[in-house]
Design a protein with these regions (language model features):
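An extended, acidic
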Residues: 20-138
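Short, structured interface segments
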Residues: 16-18
Length: 138
């Protein structure tokens, strides 16, 4: 069978099934990906320190696929360092419409026209802020 994902003003759909994200994921049950490239030394160290707080951390090496996984509920989060707009605009849009959340380490949402780095994208604002708390050592 052929599968297709699309959005309209009411949400994100896989074929004709509306995708609804679970916003109750606990850190210890979370599955996600972490970019381990391009961090400054201090952030890289912190990223490695928090990695084992999650159930599973893995990556395809393709953020586009990982955004789809978040929208599909197969992955809960992604922690990203370098942000080229062409890699992130479609995925951030899909995750937002599906009910997920994105924010930089300063809690501001991603804006493609700002030259920025360090983004967390997940199935919920709650999970994003829990990840930020880990990064801040709280």
């Amino acid at each position: 069978t052929e599968e297709f994902m699309y959005t309209d003003s009411n949400g994100v759909y896989l074929n004709d099934n509306k995708l609804i994200l679970n916003d109750n994921t606990k850190i210890e049950n979370a599955v996600g990906s972490i970019s381990f490239k391009y961090w400054d030394e201090e952030k890289r160290k912190k990223i490695f320190e928090i990695k084992n707080n999650f159930h599973n951390v893995n990556s395809y090496g393709s953020i586009g696929c990982e955004y789809f996984d978040i929208a599909l509920g197969q992955r809960n989060f992604a922690i990203l360092s370098r942000l080229y707009p062409w890699d992130h605009i479609p995925g951030v849009f899909i995750v937002r419409i599906a009910g997920g959340h994105d924010c930089h380490f300063d809690k501001l949402e991603y804006k493609f026209y700002n030259n920025s780095n360090n983004l967390i994208v997940s199935n919920s604002k709650k999970l994003n802020y829990e990840i930020l708390n880990l990064l801040e050592g709280e």
